[in-house]
Amino acid sequence: MKKEKADKALEKETDQRKQAIDAALGQIEKQFGKGSIMRLGADTRMSEMNVVSTGSLDLDIALGIGGFPSGRIIEIYGPESSGKTTLTLSAIAETQKKGGIAAFIDAEHALDPSYAKKLGVNVDDLLVAQPDNGEEALEICESLVRSNAIDLIVIDSVAALVPKAEIEGDMGDSHMGLQARLMSQALRKLTGTISKSSTTVIFINQIRMKIGVMFGSPETTTGGNALKFYASIRLDIRRIETLKEKEEPVGNRVRVKVVKNKCAPPFRQAEFDIMYANGINRESSLIDLAVRHDLVAKAGSWYSYNGEKIGQGKEQVRNFFLENPDIAFKIENQVRDLNALPLLDQAKIQTREVKSIERDTKETKETKSKQPVSFSTEADGDIAVGE
């Protein structure tokens, strides 16, 4: 009898709490709009994470979700000529292949359209801006994000987002913390909008050295600490080897460390080849992954698939994959299945030709977008850390 009374009392209390929660949710939606608060399972935007491939299968696996997530901020940093811009251009090419729209904010004024074209970027559809100062670059970024029509935005680079006050000042003037305050304010404004618009925003950053560091790494990134906190993924990319063909350098082997990852376990690594002629060598990465997962056997310099030798040395196996895209497709899907990544559609697999190392000498067309500047670099009460 006592147990029945206790159960009824508990059930009544549960109903009252449920009614109170429903009333609170109704009040919040009435005040702030529908969708301002909801149960996590009912929000498909949060439960289903859309991703865009990085262009490197090994890096897609290291990220744990198959690529760069939508609606998030990504930071890619590393030394000079380590492959930062190449990696972002590969992501742009993958976005365009899926029918998405990409934008490149070239604050460094160094984008080479002929090189981008060799990486698979459709330069005719790529939106490019070359702003005059940091405030203008971030205003352009905000306008593109608020349009809800852009899938990927790349900002190259944070170090080149120079505040207007510094540009208008004299050489040698001290502008302590100006860029850090600019980045802090911009990221506070952009983060929520980026999430709602499902736009992936990639910041390329440079490395500086801290003075007087006795223990630990003296390296740090530019633009203060705000980007480190707001970024969902931070990638450290380094060149570890120069690839040569008949004593002539033809590319670099790079190592990417996932320093921070809010979407999957961090601290994983990926290694892949970046060729000067056509960017990330997809076939070379596939060979390494196939050997790692015992899909292709390696004995000395010989590689075998299903008991049959397919080539001596990685270059011969790479040519074998290019000549037999069906086999490459099958192996790649096996690798993807073993790493819980979505499988490829066979219709998308195409044979690619090995291009010679050439650079067009056409001048880059400057596309300057003028937008009203509203980002302030004045102190706003936040602690801003400079370079």
Swiss-Prot record:
Annotated positions binding ATP: 78-85
PROSITE patterns given in the database record: RECA_1 (PS00321), RECA_2 (PS50162), RECA_3 (PS50163)
Localization of this protein: Cytoplasm
InterPro entries (UniProt xref): AAA+_ATPase, DNA_recomb/repair_RecA, DNA_recomb/repair_RecA_CS, P-loop_NTPase, RecA-like_C, RecA-like_N, RecA_ATP-bd, RecA_C_sf
Entries under Gene3D superfamilies matching the protein: P-loop containing nucleotide triphosphate hydrolases (3.40.50.300)
One term under GO cellular component: cytosol
UniProtKB keywords: ATP-binding, Cytoplasm, DNA damage, DNA recombination, DNA repair, DNA-binding, Nucleotide-binding, SOS response
Basic and acidic residues: compositionally biased ranges: 355-369
Region (Disordered): 355-387
Gene Ontology BP, a term: DNA repair
Gene Ontology terms, MF aspect: ATP binding; ATP hydrolysis activity; ATP-dependent DNA damage sensor activity; damaged DNA binding; single-stranded DNA binding
Membrane-spanning ranges: none
PANTHER family per the UniProt record, alphabetical: MITOCHONDRIAL DNA REPAIR PROTEIN RECA HOMOLOG-RELATED, RECA
HAMAP family: RecA
NCBIfam families the record matches: tigrfam_recA (TIGR02012)
Family: Belongs to the RecA family.
Function recorded in the entry: Can catalyze the hydrolysis of ATP in the presence of single-stranded DNA, the ATP-dependent uptake of single-stranded DNA by duplex DNA, and the ATP-dependent hybridization of homologous single-stranded DNAs. It interacts with LexA causing its activation and leading to its autocatalytic cleavage.
Protein name, UniProt field: Protein RecA
Species of provenance: Leptospira biflexa serovar Patoc (strain Patoc 1 / ATCC 23582 / Paris)
